[in-house]
């Protein structure tokens, strides 16, 4: 029995092959005492091992990292070499310390790789076990043996738990290096360990691991480097103790192999059990203004302000009482669940956006169902007016954080605000892992094997699922009918599901009270973003509250138009009857001339608007919301049904008058999740919270679960006084359609933005197109399309003029003047030079421009 202290899984991107479970399965199979995960420069896999390690009680789980050591992290040039170094954490504090090291290596040391210096590890030395790593280590790369002795003594002087590392490989370079390590061990009196530097669970997996490396390096089977690489990795799998002896006894002798393996167990004994910080999400402390004792008091203050802002103080007593009752109920739920602070954080960054001149969306997702959100200006959709349900957003019968999604025009500026306010170590974006799908596997592996690209593109289109087995179910004869692709299919099957790349989640932001490093380390994004090494599925599981902030380009379009026109905001407020019932806007939508209009620019959407022209000409805002809710692949049947009934077709048989009342606004079609909640509440006698639990269960589309929940609902409907026939019809209707319904709060929020952009296009087409051109100035195809559309709306677009055009498109005497930076080959930099030259010398000639180009 030995401990494997140097291992890579597929979170060593395009280098390791095995999944965490595959690696631990192999560890169990060969009887390991301990297993350490040491991926290259990251901690991506830590959470996944922690989730499953209880299934392997006989194996001690050790967390570590193969770091990139360099002399000085501030030197970033080709002469700055880096080397591999293994770092294992000894205890809980060591886990946090390693997080700090990895984070710093990304933020300050990144140069091709996240690099760290020995000085960065020094403060935490007692909490680490360090080993000298592989052929890419400093000792392996140094040819001067005396210097190697100096390096070993330096490591030992800093790290009380330092080990030299041999590896059980038969490659000539490794055999020579193992002899070197043995000699260094004797001279410096330093213990050594033996590892396998495994990049795959089993020997036969190395074939597929080699293909991953080829994908990462963009090499083919015929490349000399690819052949040499497969030789170097020949022994990089999880070997049995017998295999290690077979490989190493002839190199260093049986007794030394026994010593090296025994030392791996001694290292494992040095290490305490370490766990990832799985816990309930910890809401950070909101910095209250002076004079408020707690979050609840300040939130009520904002609500009272919003009450007046929304004009509720001018409503009749009955309408006011309805809203007061709703607010009291919502606040009782929010406060009892401890979420007052969550609303304050969202309110704060939305307020900051407004102060920074950044356009904010009307709402997104289910939050528009909250009157508290509306009164606090978190959303701009009145939930009472549109019949939106609070429990669809926050259910007192289902424990879970609120999920307030916020759309903004400039996401980066809001994140900067959060970092400036709370500190860069307390705010993070969230990592996103991209896995190799069958489609990607076919094209990538086809490239390696030398198949023509077009041939692989055509073949890959037959793979329509993200899972290989599902693809085979839909194409059972694909492999049999294409024997020429046997090798391709075999490799693609084995690579499907492996991690290929990492990116940043489009919306998620984490804010913590202490430091993100207490939870997980951070990596640096392409544009300097601070990204926690935990994805959206587990960010809340490790105790971090997630806020969703999404960048929406249309909001920048709207902001630009508003800045140009300086209109009274009431003119385009959905609560203004003149705006909501503007015939010119509905006519534009019904014409299908909706290029640039939010969410309805596609050919399919335009066709749908034209089909629904009779309904739109009735000034029915509901139609826009329904279109946005139904235009999805899994709802096309319901969409056709709605169009037929909305344009004079016969309605389906009535199940019950009470159900008709709930569905009448959508032409007796069930469209929204909120309608399902109303039906379950009315007929089943449940609360909205209980009805939402039914919605969640049905939405999982698990056959047995749907049958079980439907049966419960049938009985509830009968118990509530309805006939068994009615109960069966309702339960059948909900179970068949309930999983495909849409969130009304979301569709209404987006319908408002759709209507707003259509209104600007209908009433102020010149400024609309000017802004539309600016938002697409780097897309020549889009510009040409929109110029043609502008002609239909009688908007003239003047060609660029070197002495009059600005950087961007502008309005000049009622016409749109082409912007310099949108000209192919000019860009912003040269545009600035032209404008500066113009300002200094009056005019710029074509000759002068040509001189700048050369």
Language-model features: where?
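Domain-core and long-helix interface of multi-subunit machines
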Residues: 2-37, 41-56, 100-203, 255-257, ...
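Noncatalytic, beta-rich nucleic-acid-contacting surfaces in large DNA/RNA-processing enzymes
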Residues: 34-37, 200, 211, 220, ...
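Glycine-rich loop at the start of a catalytic domain that most often binds anionic cofactors/ligands
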Residues: 43-57, 76, 207-210, 374-384
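Hydrophobic or amphipathic alpha-helical targeting/insertion segments
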Residues: 48-62, 68-69, 73-108
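Structural signature of the thiamine diphosphate
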Residues: 59, 259-286, 435
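Solvent-exposed alpha-helices and their adjacent loops that cap or buttress functional pockets
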Residues: 78-79, 122-123, 501-503
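Phosphate/diphosphate-binding loops
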Residues: 214-217, 222-265, 396-422
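Positively charged, low-complexity/disordered segments
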Residues: 852-854
């Amino acid at each position: 029995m030995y401990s494997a202290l140097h291992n890579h899984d597929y979170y060593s991107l395009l280098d390791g092959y095995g999944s965490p479970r595959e690696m631990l399965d192999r560890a169990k199979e060969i009887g390991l005492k301990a297993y350490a995960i040491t991926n290259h420069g990251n901690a991506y896999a830590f959470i996944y091992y922690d989730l499953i390690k209880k299934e392997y009680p006989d194996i001690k789980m050790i967390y570590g990292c193969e770091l990139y050591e360099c002399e000085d992290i501030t030197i970033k040039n080709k002469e700055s070499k880096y080397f591999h170094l293994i770092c294992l954490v000894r205890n809980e504090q060591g886990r946090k310390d390693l997080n700090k090291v990895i984070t710093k290596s990304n933020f300050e040391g990144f140069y091709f790789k996240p690099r760290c210096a020995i000085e960065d590890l020094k403060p935490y030395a007692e909490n680490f076990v360090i080993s000298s790593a592989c052929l890419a280590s400093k000792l392996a790369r140094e040819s001067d043996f005396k210097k190697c002795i100096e390096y070993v003594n330096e490591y030992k002087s800093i790290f009380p738990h330092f080990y030299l590392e041999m590896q059980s490989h038969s490659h000539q370079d490794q055999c020579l290096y193992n002899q070197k390590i043995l000699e260094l061990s004797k001279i410096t009196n330093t213990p050594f360990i033996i590892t396998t530097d495994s990049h795959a669970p089993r020997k036969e997996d190395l074939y597929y691991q080699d293909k991953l490396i080829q994908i990462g390096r963009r090499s083919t089977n015929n490349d000399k480097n690819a052949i040499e690489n497969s030789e170097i990795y020949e022994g990089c799998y999880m070997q049995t103790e017998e295999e290690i002896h077979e490989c190493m006894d002839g190199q260093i002798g049986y007794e030394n192999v026994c010593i090296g393996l025994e030392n791996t167990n001694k290292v494992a004994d040095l290490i305490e059990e370490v766990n990832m910080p799985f816990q309930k999400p910890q809401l950070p402390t909101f910095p209250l203004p002076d004079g408020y004792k707690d979050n609840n008091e300040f939130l009520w203050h904002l609500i009272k302000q919003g009450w007046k802002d929304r004009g509720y103080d001018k409503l009749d007593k009955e309408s006011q009482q309805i809203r007061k009752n709703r607010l009291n109920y919502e606040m009782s739920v929010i406060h009892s669940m401890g979420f007052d602070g969550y609303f304050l954080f969202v309110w704060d960054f939305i307020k900051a956006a407004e102060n920074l001149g950044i356009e904010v969306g009307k709402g997104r997702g289910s939050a528009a169902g909250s009157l508290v959100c509306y009164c606090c200006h978190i959303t701009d959709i009145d939930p009472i007016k549109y019949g939106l349900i609070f429990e669809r957003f926050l259910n007192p019968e289902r424990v879970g954080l609120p999920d307030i999604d916020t759309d903004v025009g400039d996401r980066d500026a809001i994140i900067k605000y959060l970092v400036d306010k709370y500190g860069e170590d307390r705010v993070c974006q969230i990592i996103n892992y991209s896995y190799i799908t069958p489609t990607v596997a076919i094209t990538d592996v086809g490239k390696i094997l030398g198949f023509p690209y077009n041939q692989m593109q055509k073949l890959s289109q037959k793979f329509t699922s993200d899972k290989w087995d599902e693809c085979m179910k839909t194409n059972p004869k694909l492999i049999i009918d294409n024997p020429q692709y046997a090798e391709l299919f075999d490799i693609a099957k084995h690579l499907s599901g492996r991690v290929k790349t990492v990116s940043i989640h489009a919306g998620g932001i984490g804010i913590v009270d202490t430091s993100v490093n207490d939870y997980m380390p951070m990596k640096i994004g392409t544009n300097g973003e601070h990204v926690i090494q935990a994805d959206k599925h587990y960010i809340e599981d490790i105790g971090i509250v997630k806020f969703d902030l999404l960048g929406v380009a249309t909001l920048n379009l709207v902001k630009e138009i508003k800045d140009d026109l300086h209109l009274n905001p009431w003119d385009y407020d959905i609560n203004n009857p003149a705006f909501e019932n503007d015939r010119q806007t509905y006519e534009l939508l019904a014409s299908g001339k909706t290029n640039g209009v939010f969410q309805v620019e596609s050919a399919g959407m335009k066709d749908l608007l034209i089909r629904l022209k009779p309904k739109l000409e009735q000034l029915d805002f509901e139609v826009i919301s329904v279109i946005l809710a139904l235009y999805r692949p899994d709802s096309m049947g319901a969409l056709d049904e709605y169009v037929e009934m909305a344009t004079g077709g016969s309605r389906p048989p009535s199940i019950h008058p009470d159900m008709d009342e709930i569905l009448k606004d959508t032409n007796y079609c069930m469209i929204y999740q909120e309608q399902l909640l109303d039906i379950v509440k009315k007929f089943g006698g449940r609360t909205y919270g209980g009805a939402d639990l039914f919605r969640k269960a049905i939405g999982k589309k698990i056959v047995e679960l749907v049958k079980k929940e439907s049966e419960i609902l049938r009985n509830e409907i009968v118990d509530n006084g309805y006939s068994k026939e009615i109960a069966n019809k309702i339960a059948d209707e909900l179970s068949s359609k309930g999983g495909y319904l849409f969130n009304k709060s979301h569709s209404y929020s987006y319908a408002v933005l759709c209507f707003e952009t259509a209104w600007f296009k209908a009433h102020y087409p010149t400024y609309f197109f000017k802004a539309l051109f600016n938002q697409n100035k780097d897309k020549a195809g889009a510009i040409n399309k929109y110029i043609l559309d502008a002609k239909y709306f009688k908007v003239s677009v003047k060609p660029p003029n070197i002495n009059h055009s600005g950087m961007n498109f502008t309005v000049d005497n009622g016409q749109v003047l082409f912007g310099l930076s949108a000209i192919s080959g000019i860009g912003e930099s040269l545009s600035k030079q032209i404008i500066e030259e113009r300002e200094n010398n009056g005019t710029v000639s074509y000759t002068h421009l040509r001189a700048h180009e050369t």
